[in-house]
């Protein structure tokens, strides 16, 4: 899978080339995925050999997924020029997962403009 921000940059590159339809398709792909999977309940299936790792690192994967979906929607909105919406999505991701580094990076980028 491609990193999410790579899809944003592909869209921005298409935008620079005047290929607006291709650009918007990339941005909406990010937003659509985030919207479609925001409420997913994530359960990890694992083999018994990995059980000790899961017992040590008890993460809430549904919460992480929700944060990631907000991040994706933030990226898509950056591409569409909706920076206030993007900031709101990044803030939601950070509230859900304070260590979501990329949401912090892109929130800072949006606020610096």
For the regions a protein language model found, what residue spans apply to each?
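Residue-level recognition of tetratricopeptide repeat
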Residues: 3, 20, 37, 66, ...
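Alpha-helical junction/boundary sensor with strong preference for TPR arrays
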Residues: 34-41, 97
